[in-house]
């Protein structure tokens, strides 16, 4: 019995059974039972009731704690319950051993904190014995399951418990006498010493399930397990199923015969000696700090999922960590970079909370789950931020370590099937390696998975990690822009691969044979090609790697590869648009070089260079022609595909390649022309589809490209234009483009092709009227061609448009009908053609055809030609060949009603020689002088011959559709034309065709006809031209007689020459209608004075104006002199005075594609001409500067009226400050209030918009008038009376000074009051806020905005300095912007700075001063004498602030204002200027930031700088 008891005690669950045995420590060998009889005897002697009571108390405490805390846990831990005691009369020792394990103490194995578990060391896991794998009883497996009461202790077991308690406490286990509350406090104290990342790590480890402790099996064959199963099959089966049911843990290696050590299930973590807390019931994570609030998504579940999915697909890239809590995120474009700040949870994109860049960081960089509440918190606490970055850095550092050893081990073990790895290593690879493998399969730049089919690259010398090839190219571009060597974004080791960041030229050996000679030749002909080729040759495609060509394009690309090489062609199919653009630039370079070489163009040593080259034979004879033909054919085939690219920059590059090909391609014979036309046909078809692109820039550029093609040899796409002595015959001009439009019959369901062709037709009719309306240009009247044949081009286009009138696509139908009606209006003076258009409408009886016919008849009635059409006037015109040149409108048509618009009829009557188009009433100079004062309004309707316009529809201002088509003519017509001077910008004009190339102009067409729709341009542009007219208006009576009747009050030049509706109505539309008697004007040009030179009669560039179906006419002022001081009467015009002209937004071929021609061989006289031309350059520049300054001063001379608040008005001579009644009489000299104006009564204070030293600024509203104001409240109360007097005096000075200032760029004051202890300064409301506020909200300004604001700032400072006022505090926070964003006003005239210098408390103004110090001049900070130049220095600092959205000197990084003062005061150089500024603006900033005050120019002189003149 004693032996049995001793054996039971030695093999029981008591931790003390092994702890007391010297052989039992740590090794886990077989227990020796030599002391078992003595131990059993001691236990029996001490048996009594005390053991049972103590066991009952412990049981109650455990049950109490469990009942409180078990329900709070996400999953219930496993308790190791013992089996019921067996009978002492067991037939064999083995059942006795099994029964011995079922003592009354029921030891509990509580999973320890994961941070405390490790592979070695004494702990609870070693001291608490349990059955083998799966034998633990799930005491808390189900929350609602009632626990079975613990087995009653046997009498033999109780003394054993007493003896255990009397011995020393076991290692790592508290005495059971400790109160649970004390242990709870002890654990909480321990938790406060644990870092936040440790909590997160423990919590993550805890999710994997509790630790199941494995004992040392008594026998290696597991017989004890079998007997336990026989004793309590229910419990054993349930406990064995519990770990498997959780699915969190892999089976323990303890079951294997080799597993002879007791190890916990938390591998790889150092073990701590932490006391187990049985009452915590598995709660491992100590109490945490409260998380941040607002952890819920502000969007609906659907919207939340949509945003998350969008972020997970977004093409965003993690460029680098730029601060402790911030990342730099980039897009596909190297210019799109954003700073994301974690903690404040904001982003520099300023797109509001939870922008895509912030979510990218949270979801893909930090790898939060979409359901994580931290994702949707507006701010994160410091410990949460630290936790996120800790995880992020641990993930990155795990990848930086050289190739994953666990991965290697896994492969080795898989291949060798060896069992050399320890059980802990195996479990590590099963749990941690899966995570690490997932990390290694993720690109560290885009944070997305890497697939096998994607193009990947690898860090060869460093971490050996794989990355996306595309992502690495973006990282390489970032390194290049920062002028840094290319390094691995993970391990920072130097990138060995030359796939990226390479600038060497490719070797000619690698190039295809047809281009090899061209590449070698162009190296030596750089002087010929000019700087453009020198720059463009510095790119290479090798760093993009070999791109895969899609299988569907293999056959198509085969001939391209033979000509251009696999490398270039492969890049054309890249998914990265940057690669495609670079490939096209390379293609343009190669094509132009090959064509130049084939044409024998070089610097003169081409023979020697080609002879020494490997492909020298390719430069002679027919081989050149074959090379040229192959290159052109392959290039056209490529362009037909790439011109359909949806990316705008790639499309521009394609058009540049088209131009490079055409200008270097000769075309001398008709056969060559036909071949070139055939090759270009697919390219033109692709561009035609682009004419209807949804992107307005793309559509405008496409139309402009085809118009350049229509210009033939006079356009930018002239064939052989850059070849010396080419003599190319051209490709056909308008006729060729017409053939492309009409040649391929597009299906009616392909609306893109139809709409693109119609858009081009619409513009063709405007740009080339002489091609489609022969009556516009006077041709030889003796020609015998019938009218219908002369109009065959127009009829073919209208037939094409007529087919689409009933199209189901609304835009196609509308545009077709508009083209038809517009053309019908143009031919009203030619009844033959007009009747033909009516006949064409008779082919169908559909609704649209019927309606169009009615509208044409209405037009005929309007111009009174309906009867002539019905009577068949074509057959009764007395055989006059030029009858269509006659006016077919009665004289009474010139009379206008009040609603009608002015018309103009120009009579060119016949003389004995016929139509006297070459004989004018005065010399051409006289006519030019007379017409100098006549400008073209948006709807002038003068035609070139005896032509009158129909009466247009009544003016509809609400639609804002003043369509006008002005046509710039060149001196190529054979007859002089009386038109108005052209006011179009240079981009809308066409160079005159030289006499030598006039033969290319078929049918005496005017090549220079360029219609210019005149939309509402900026008032700044308007004033420029009005001033020009003011200077050019002749001082004689004739000019008064010729005062412009059709002129708008503000001429509106623009190159915006497309027909769609303008964005806003022309300002002149709101003018009053002129007197009807003055709205008709007839210029009778019969005279005896002759002008026989047909080319000399029209010396000025002039305009023919073609009315459309929606033409709107605008009357004008009677006088051509404009008073600039009274001209501005609209706040919008005043605010837009310095904005960029609207024409800058128009995209044309010249602005986007055309480049300067290579330098031609200069004549010997060139140098002399240059010297003569530049002799008076200085005088000319000075005159221009004075003119610019005069314009600037004149433009800023007037401004809007200031709102009036009655209670703030004072009589003349009275003080501006009105003292309220309840204010003490301690402030003499102020005006007593006649009407009270008190806060919260007569005016209401709104939100705070600014905070100063002793002042605060609020939005306010006047109750009586509703006027919005800004009120600056300044308290004047100080500690001493002397200080208070100084403050009051300074405030009075500022208020009185502001009351006398009146300038458009100076803030204006509505009034001031003194109420109680405050001065209230009421100033005008500037809704845009300060420049600093806009910079913080929207980021740095574009350069055009910086120039606009800088100019207005200089105007305001110039006004202040002329009035002997120094601002001393010019900075972004004191520059206010109005609601339009166009008007800048200077505010805060230094009172705060003076107050701050009066001796205030330490640090009281540190924040305000810190913002001011960065803008202060060095001499001011040094305490030296200063003057107006200190404001000029601040202007330079403001330019830096506006250009890069942060103050100069990196002031935001200085927390100590004294250090910043010392830095500026001791500076020997100016603050750094952003490198992206243009040379002009950079020069202005450098002038402002001269260290010596005397070297800085005055603000008035700076206004003369050319950077401000270019915007006029």
Swiss-Prot record:
Active site: 1369
Highest taxon, organism lineage: Eukaryota
Modified residues (N-acetylalanine): 2
Keyword Ion transport: no
GO molecular function, one term: protein kinase activity
SUPFAM superfamilies membership: ARM repeat, Protein kinase-like (PK-like), RING/U-box
Cofactor(s) required for function per UniProt: Mg(2+)
Function: Component of a protein kinase signal transduction cascade. Activates the ERK and JNK kinase pathways by phosphorylation of MAP2K1 and MAP2K4. May phosphorylate the MAPK8/JNK1 kinase. Activates CHUK and IKBKB, the central protein kinases of the NF-kappa-B pathway.
Zinc finger (RING-type): 443-492
Modified residues (Phosphoserine): 21, 35, 137, 154, 275, 292, 297, 300, 507, 531, 923, 1018, 1043
Mutagenesis or variant effect for residue 616 to R: In SRXY6; uncertain significance
Residues annotated to bind ATP: 1249-1257, 1272
UniProt biased composition (Polar residues): 1045-1057, 1066-1087
Post-translational modification: Autophosphorylated.
Keyword hit for Cell cycle: no
Species per Swiss-Prot/TrEMBL record: Homo sapiens
GO cellular component entries: cytoplasm; cytosol; tight junction
Region (Disordered): 1-37, 67-181, 213-304, 416-436, 511-532, 602-624, 933-972, 1032-1087
Pathology linked to this chain's protein: 46,XY sex reversal 6: A disorder of sex development. Affected individuals have a 46,XY karyotype but present as phenotypically normal females.
Keywords assigned: Acetylation, ATP-binding, Kinase, Magnesium, Metal-binding, Nucleotide-binding, Phosphoprotein, Serine/threonine-protein kinase, Transferase, Zinc, Zinc-finger
Activity modulation notes: Activated by autophosphorylation on Thr-1400 and Thr-1412 following oligomerization.
Family matches, as SMART domains: S_TKc
Protein's name in the database: Mitogen-activated protein kinase kinase kinase 1
Family to which the UniProt record says this protein belongs: Belongs to the protein kinase superfamily. STE Ser/Thr protein kinase family. MAP kinase kinase kinase subfamily.
């Amino acid at each position: 019995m004693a032996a049995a008891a001793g054996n039971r005690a030695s093999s029981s669950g008591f931790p003390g059974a092994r702890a007391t045995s010297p052989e039992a420590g740590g090794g886990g060998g077989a227990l020796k039972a030599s002391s078992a009889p003595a131990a059993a005897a001691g236990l029996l002697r001490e048996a009594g009731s005390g053991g049972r009571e103590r066991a009952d108390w412990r049981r109650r405490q455990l049950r109490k704690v469990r009942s409180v805390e078990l329900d709070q846990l996400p999953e219930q831990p496993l308790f190791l319950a013992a089996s019921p005691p067996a009978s002492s009369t067991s037939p064999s020792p083995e059942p006795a051993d099994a029964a011995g394990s079922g003592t009354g103490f029921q030891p509990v194995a509580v999973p320890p904190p994961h941070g405390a578990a490790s592979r070695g060391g004494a702990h609870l896991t070693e001291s608490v014995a349990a059955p083998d794998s799966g034998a633990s009883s799930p005491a808390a497996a189900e929350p609602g399951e009632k626990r079975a009461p613990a087995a009653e202790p046997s009498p033999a077991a109780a003394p054993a418990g007493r003896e255990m308690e009397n011995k020393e406490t076991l290692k790592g286990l508290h005495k059971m006498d400790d109160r649970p509350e004390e242990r709870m406090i002890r654990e909480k104290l321990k938790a406060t010493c644990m870092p936040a990342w440790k909590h997160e790590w423990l919590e993550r480890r805890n999710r994997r399930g509790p630790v199941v402790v494995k004992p040392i099996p008594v026998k290696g064959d597991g017989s004890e397990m079998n007997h336990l199963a026989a004793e309590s099959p229910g419990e054993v089966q349930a406990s064995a199923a519990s770990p498997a049911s959780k699915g969190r843990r892999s089976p323990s290696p303890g079951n294997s015969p080799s597993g002879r050590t007791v190890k916990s299930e938390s591998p790889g973590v150092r073990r701590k000696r932490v006391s187990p807390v049985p009452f915590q019931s598995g709660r491992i994570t100590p109490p945490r700090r409260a998380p941040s609030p607002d952890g819920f998504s502000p969007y609906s579940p659907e919207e939340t999922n949509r945003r998350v999915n969008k972020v997970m697909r977004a093409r965003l890239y993690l460029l680098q960590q730029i601060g402790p809590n911030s990342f730099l995120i980039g897009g596909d474009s190297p210019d799109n970079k954003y700073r994301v700040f974690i903690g404040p949870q904001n982003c520099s994109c300023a797109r509001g909370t939870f922008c895509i860049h912030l979510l990218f960081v949270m979801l893909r960089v930090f790898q939060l789950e979409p359901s994580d509440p931290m994702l949707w918190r507006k701010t994160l606490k410091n410990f949460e931020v630290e936790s996120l970055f800790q995880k992020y850095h641990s993930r990155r550092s795990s990848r930086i370590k050289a190739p994953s050893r666990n991965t290697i081990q896994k492969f080795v073990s898989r291949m060798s099937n060896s069992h050399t790895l320890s059980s802990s290593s195996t479990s590590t690879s099963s749990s941690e390696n899966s995570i690490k493998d997932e990390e290694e399969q993720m690109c560290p730049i885009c944070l997305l998975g890497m697939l096998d089919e994607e193009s990947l690259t690898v860090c060869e010398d460093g971490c050996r990690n794989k990355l996306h090839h595309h992502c690495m190219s973006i990282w390489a571009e970032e390194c290049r822009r920062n002028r840094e060597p290319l390094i691995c974004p993970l391990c920072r080791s130097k990138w060995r691969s030359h796939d990226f960041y390479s600038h060497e030229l490719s070797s000619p050996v690698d190039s295809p044979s047809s281009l090899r000679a061209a590449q070698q030749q162009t190296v030596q002909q750089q002087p010929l090609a000019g700087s453009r080729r020198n720059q463009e040759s510095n790119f290479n495609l090798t760093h993009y790697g070999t791109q895969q060509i899609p299988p569907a394009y293999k056959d198509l690309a085969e001939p391209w590869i033979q000509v251009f090489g696999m490398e270039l062609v492969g890049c054309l199919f890249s998914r990265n648009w940057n690669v495609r653009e670079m490939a096209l630039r390379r293609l343009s370079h190669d094509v132009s070089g090959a064509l130049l070489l084939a044409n024998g163009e070089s610097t003169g040593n081409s023979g020697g260079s080609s002879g020494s080259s490997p492909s020298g034979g390719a430069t002679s004879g027919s081989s050149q022609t074959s090379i040229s033909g192959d290159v052109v054919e392959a290039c056209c085939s490529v362009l037909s595909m790439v011109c359909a690219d949806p990316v705008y920059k790639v499309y521009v590059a394609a058009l540049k390649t088209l131009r490079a090909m055409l200008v270097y391609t000769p075309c001398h014979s008709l056969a060559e022309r036909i071949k070139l036309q055939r090759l270009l046909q697919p390219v033109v078809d692709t561009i035609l589809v682009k004419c209807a692109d949804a992107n307005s820039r793309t559509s405008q550029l496409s139309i402009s490209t085809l118009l350049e093609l229509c210009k033939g040899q006079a356009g930018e796409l002239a064939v052989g234009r850059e070849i010396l002595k080419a003599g190319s015959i051209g490709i056909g001009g308008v006729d060729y483009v017409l053939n492309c439009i009409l040649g391929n019959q597009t299906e009616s369901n392909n609306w893109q092709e139809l709409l693109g062709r119609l858009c081009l037709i619409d513009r063709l009719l405007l740009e080339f009227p002489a091609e489609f309306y022969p009556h516009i240009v006077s041709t030889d009247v003796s020609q015998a061609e019938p009218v219908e044949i002369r109009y065959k081009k127009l009829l073919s286009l209208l037939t094409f448009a007529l087919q689409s009138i009933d199209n189901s696509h609304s835009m196609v139908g509308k545009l077709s009908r508009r083209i038809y009606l517009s053309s019908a209006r143009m031919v009203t003076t030619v009844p033959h053609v007009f009747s033909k258009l009516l006949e064409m409408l008779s082919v169908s009886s559909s609704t649209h055809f019927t309606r169009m016919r009615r509208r044409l008849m209405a037009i005929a009635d309007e111009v009174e030609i309906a009867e002539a059409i019905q009577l068949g006037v074509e057959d009764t015109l007395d055989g006059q060949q030029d009858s269509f040149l006659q006016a077919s409108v009665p004289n009474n048509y010139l009379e206008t009603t009040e609603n009608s618009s002015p018309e103009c009829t120009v009579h060119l009557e016949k003389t004995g020689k016929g139509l006297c188009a070459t004989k004018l009433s005065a010399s051409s100079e006289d006519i030019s002088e007379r017409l100098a004062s006549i400008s073209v309004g948006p709807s002038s309707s003068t035609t070139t011959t005896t032509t009158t316009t129909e009466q247009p529809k009544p003016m509809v201002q609400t639609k804002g559709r003043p369509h006008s088509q002005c046509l710039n003519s060149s001196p190529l017509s054979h007859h002089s034309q009386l038109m108005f001077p052209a006011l179009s910008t240079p981009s809308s004009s066409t160079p005159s065709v030289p006499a030598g190339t006039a033969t290319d102009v078929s049918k005496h067409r005017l090549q220079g006809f360029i219609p210019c729709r005149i939309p509402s341009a900026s008032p700044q542009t308007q004033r420029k031209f009005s001033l020009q007219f003011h200077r050019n208006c002749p001082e004689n009576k004739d000019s008064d007689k010729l005062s412009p009747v059709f002129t708008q009050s503000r001429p509106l030049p623009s190159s915006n020459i497309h027909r769609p509706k303008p964005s806003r109505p022309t300002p002149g539309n709101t003018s009053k209608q002129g007197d009807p008697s003055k709205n008709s004007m007839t210029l009778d040009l019969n005279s005896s004075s002759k002008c026989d030179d047909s080319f000399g009669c029209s010396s000025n560039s002039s305009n023919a104006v073609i009315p459309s179906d929606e033409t709107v006419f605008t009357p004008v002022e009677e006088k051509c002199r404009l008073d600039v001081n009274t001209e501005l009467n609209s706040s919008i015009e005043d605010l837009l005075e310095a904005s960029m002209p609207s024409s800058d937004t128009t995209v044309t071929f010249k602005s986007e594609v055309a480049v300067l021609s290579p330098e031609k061989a200069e004549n010997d006289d060139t140098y002399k001409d240059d010297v003569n031309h530049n002799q008076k350059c200085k005088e000319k520049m000075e005159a221009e500067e004075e003119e610019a300054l005069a314009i600037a001063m004149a433009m800023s001379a007037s401004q809007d009226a200031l709102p009036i608040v009655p209670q703030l008005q004072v009589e003349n001579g009275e003080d501006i400050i009105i003292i309220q009644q309840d204010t003490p009489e301690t402030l003499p000299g102020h005006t007593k209030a006649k009407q009270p104006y008190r806060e919260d009564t007569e005016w209401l204070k709104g939100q705070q918009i600014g905070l100063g030293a002793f002042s605060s600024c609020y939005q306010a509203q006047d109750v009586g008038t509703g006027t919005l104001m800004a009120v600056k409240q300044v308290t004047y109360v100080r500690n001493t009376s002397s200080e208070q007097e100084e403050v009051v005096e300074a405030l009075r000075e500022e208020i009185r000074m502001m009351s006398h200032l009146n300038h458009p760029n100076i803030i204006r004051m509505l009034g001031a009051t003194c109420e109680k202890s405050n001065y209230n300064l009421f100033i005008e409301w500037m809704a845009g806020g300060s420049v600093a506020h806009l910079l913080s909200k929207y980021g740095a300004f574009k350069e055009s905005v910086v120039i606009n604001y800088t100019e207005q700032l200089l105007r305001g400072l110039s006004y202040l300095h002329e009035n002997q006022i120094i601002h001393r505090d010019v900075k972004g926070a004191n520059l206010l912007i109005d609601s339009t964003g166009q008007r800048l006003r200077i505010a805060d005239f230094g009172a705060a700075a003076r107050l701050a210098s009066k001796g205030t408390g330490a640090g009281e103004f540190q924040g305000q001063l810190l913002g001011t110090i960065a803008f202060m001049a060095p001499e001011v900070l040094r305490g030296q004498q200063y003057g107006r130049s200190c404001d000029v220095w601040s202007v330079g600092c403001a330019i830096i602030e506006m250009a890069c959205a942060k103050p100069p000197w990196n002031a935001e990084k200085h927390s100590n204002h004294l250090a910043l003062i010392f830095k500026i005061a001791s500076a020997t150089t100016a603050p750094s200027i952003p490198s992206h500024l243009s040379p002009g603006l950079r020069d202005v900033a450098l002038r402002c930031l001269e260290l010596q005050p005397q070297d800085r120019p005055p603000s008035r002189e700076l206004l003369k700088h050319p950077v401000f003149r270019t915007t006029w």
